[in-house]
Amino acid sequence: MTGHMVPLLPRRSFLANLLSFGVVTSVGSAFAANVSKAAWPPIDATFLFSADVHTCLISGGVLSPNCAQEGKTDANLLRHVAALNRIAEFDWPTQIGGVATGLAGAGQKIAKPLGLVIGGDMTDDGGGQVKVPGEGHQLLQFSSRYQEGTGPDRVHFPVYNGLGNHDLDQDGVLPHIDWYRRELRDYVELNHRPTVFYKPPVAVANYDIDSDNYSWDWGGLHLVQLQRFGGDTNKGAISGLDWLKQDLANSAADGRPIILFQHYGWDSFSLEKWDPAKMTFDDEGSGHAHWWGDDERAALLAALKGYNVVGLFHGHEHDTPMIYNQDGLDLFKPIATFKGGFAAVHITNHYMDVVLAQARGTEGNVNFLKAFSKRFS
């Protein structure tokens, strides 16, 4: 499979770097800070990223309406888990579609991932709604597949959880209107926020209780989970931008590379606005934003200015593997998890390699779809 990428932002000026053969090289980041590699620990981090899991169980083996037709089934998640667990058996591809990938590590064995980062929409309906507050079936389904464990039905490495609009936009039945999003936020916090009295399964270095944004480090690489998006205030969310500014000032002011994760991106679907002529949201609309607006993106970009952001990984759109550059950011979006999609990433002091991939079959095989590489000077 070679993967063919169609133009995503026809009305907006950006550097596409989207080659139909799936091979992309990079330009410098507008956010690069003055870099002194001796100032931070060595970097040799391999990790996976996946978004849009959309667990769909509502009771027993019953799925939410339309989930089976859309492919949001447990069988498809098991295929995805099998591919993730076998990724270290594969080499970084030397070619995709007969074209050299240009990866710095091409032909080398993929190392066991340090973790799997989730880019939102863990569940399809706010964790799996029930009228009486209780643990939702969809959240149970998610944790039974995407919490580190053994055997063929769970991923075999730590999972860094992230929330999207499907996790956070579902209102509960009065008087428990915030129950479901609180349940999802509690799940993230209990998995990642350490306290004096509690050690979570995947502890992180810096957790913001208000926004549920968090950060951690793999050697000299700084990573930040921004949930739906950095600065989100929808459905009562508290903006994490002040926390982000302080986190970057404390942990990345020395110019070390930074990776960001959130649900929304800069693709045409994420940037939809209301189109009054067509009475719908689309990429030609001039009205209010469907997902996140120009001012919200500008505020996030302002918080990142001056830092060495080497990549942002997102989800939200399900069908198209995307590697593109917008507003000075290198952006990466795999196909949705329930469709088998994920990204494999390797970052060292000297380079960053990314491949977008898709699970194939039930035995853990993988198709590599697109590749990206950039060297650090």
Model-derived features: positions:
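N-terminal secretory signal peptides
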Residues: 1-10, 20
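His/acidic metal-ligating clusters that form di-metal
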Residues: 86-102, 106-112, 154-155, 210, ...
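Short, solvent-exposed loop/turn elements at domain surfaces
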Residues: 47, 55-61, 225, 233-234, ...
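Extended active-site neighborhood of metal-dependent phosphoesterases/phosphodiesterases
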Residues: 125-249, 299-305, 322-355, 372-375
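Twin-arginine (Tat) signal peptide motif
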Residues: 6-15, 29
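Short, flexible/disordered intra-domain loops and linkers
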Residues: 60-73, 128-137, 172-179, 271-292
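Active-site glycine-centered loops adjacent to acidic/histidine catalytic or metal-binding residues
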Residues: 52, 120-121, 164-165, 263, ...
